[in-house]
């Protein structure tokens, strides 16, 4: 029971949400009541996947979201399933979260030595530097000496796309790589291409010894196998909501990955408030959809609803202890209340998907909503905060 539910959690958005209906030329069958897609919506994407498997082209899929995506658990089974069927084009996006002290997926590692990094997050878009593709931006002094180690043991790579601002110098690599610098910028950023003749699982990036650049600002990298197939990128920021990503400058950055499919997996942070207003959420969702359709007109969109969650509140009282009852022991009790807002957000997402003629997967309902979530708790598959989920 425990293992089957863990598998369901990991596979719901990925395999059940997409693969079960990706090749349906007609309406989605009633056997998948939690999934909506217009007739033939994924037909062109299905064809692109078949071509990639046969001719060595690449299909790019991006899953954008919050902490559930930053941890990598949700996207991993989707990547594994699609790459097993259509070819492994590489690990895809590598978030440099560790360089600012945050968590990251466990199938890659990014380290750094030298002068510390300063970061700005998309949670506060009024920052001093242009926001990067990963929902963060990292900077250090141009004169700083630093190295960055990138390791991807499960996905050997022959090529790396490195994202930096146009005013920052390219990084060099060891083992030595052929460097092709980006010529055209998307917003403030350009993409350099590092290529190796043999596949590697670990490389070191180094800043120039004599650096006369105006700044040293980097946003992350993409790892490619050098073969055709599928790239599945996971981009997430802890605490992110639709309102944080619904910015023209940010959506423009997504075009660097040339996604044929964009999976938007948010909603938990949008509705995790006792002051939640559905109208505010709808405005943010509509703004995001408008920007994606305008800036990425050829990209298919799949919305996923947030999983069930709980509000929690701590209460403190004191218990008199000791033989003479002169000592007081502090006792903290945690109480939980189901987050009804998640149900409202899920209903709104499914409704808006149908209105816009895009796809949506109701993860909230697939997990049983309020009535079904107790079994997840009983099996220990919810974290102590009853918002996040264990693996």
Model regions and ranges:
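Conserved SGNH/GDSL esterase-like catalytic core that processes O-acyl groups on lipids
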Residues: 70-176, 183-283, 388
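Short glycine- and acidic-rich boundary segments immediately preceding or forming the N-terminal edge
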Residues: 20-48
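Alpha-helical scaffolding within the catalytic cores
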Residues: 37-51, 243-256, 286-291, 312, ...
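Bacterial N-terminal signal peptides
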Residues: 10-21
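Short hydrophobic beta-strand that contains or immediately precedes a catalytic carboxylate
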Residues: 61-65
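Catalytic His-Asp segment of secreted/periplasmic serine-dependent ester chemistry enzymes
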Residues: 238, 247, 309-391
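Bacterial N-terminal signal peptides that target proteins for export
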Residues: 1-11
């Amino acid at each position: 029971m425990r293992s089957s539910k863990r598998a369901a959690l990991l596979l719901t958005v990925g395999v059940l949400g997409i693969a079960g209906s990706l090749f349906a030329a007609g309406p989605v069958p009633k056997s998948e009541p939690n999934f909506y897609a217009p007739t033939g919506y994924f037909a062109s994407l299905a064809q692109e996947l078949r071509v990639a498997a046969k001719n060595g082209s690449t299909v790019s899929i991006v899953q954008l979201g919050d902490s559930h995506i930053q941890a990598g658990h949700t996207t991993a089974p989707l990547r594994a399933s699609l790459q097993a069927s259509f070819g492994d084009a590489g690990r895809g996006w590598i978030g440099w979260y560790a360089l600012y002290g945050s968590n990251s997926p466990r199938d890659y590692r990014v380290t750094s030595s030298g002068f510390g990094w300063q970061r700005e997050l998309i949670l506060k878009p009024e920052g001093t530097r242009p926001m990067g593709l990963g929902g963060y931006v990292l900077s250090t002094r141009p004169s700083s000496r630093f190295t960055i180690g990138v390791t991807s043991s499960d996905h050997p790579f022959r090529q790396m796309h490195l994202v930096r601002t146009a005013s920052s110098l390219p990084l060099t690599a060891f083992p030595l790589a052929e460097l092709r610098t980006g010529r055209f910028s998307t917003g403030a950023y350009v993409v350099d291409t590092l290529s190796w003749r043999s596949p590697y699982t670990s490389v070191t990036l180094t800043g120039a010894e004599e650096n006369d650049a105006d700044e040293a600002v980097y946003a992350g990298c993409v790892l490619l196998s050098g073969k055709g197939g599928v790239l599945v990128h996971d981009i997430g920021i802890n605490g992110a909501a639709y309102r944080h990503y619904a910015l023209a400058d940010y959506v423009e950055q997504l075009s660097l990955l040339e996604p044929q499919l964009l999976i938007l997996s948010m909603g938990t942070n949008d509705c995790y408030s006792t002051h939640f207003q559905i109208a505010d959420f709808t405005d943010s969702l509509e703004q995001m959809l408008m920007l994606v359709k305008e800036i990425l007109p050829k990209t298919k969109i799949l919305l996923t609803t947030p999983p069930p969650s709980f509000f929690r509140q701590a209460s403190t009282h004191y218990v008199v202890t000791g033989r003479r009852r002169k000592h007081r022991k502090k006792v903290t009790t945690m109480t939980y209340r189901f987050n009804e807002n998640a149900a409202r957000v899920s209903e709104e997402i499914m409704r808006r998907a149908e209105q816009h003629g895009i796809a949506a997967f109701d993860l909230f309902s697939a997990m049983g909503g309020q009535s079904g979530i107790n079994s997840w708790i009983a099996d220990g598959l919810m974290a102590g905060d009853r918002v996040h989920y264990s693996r």
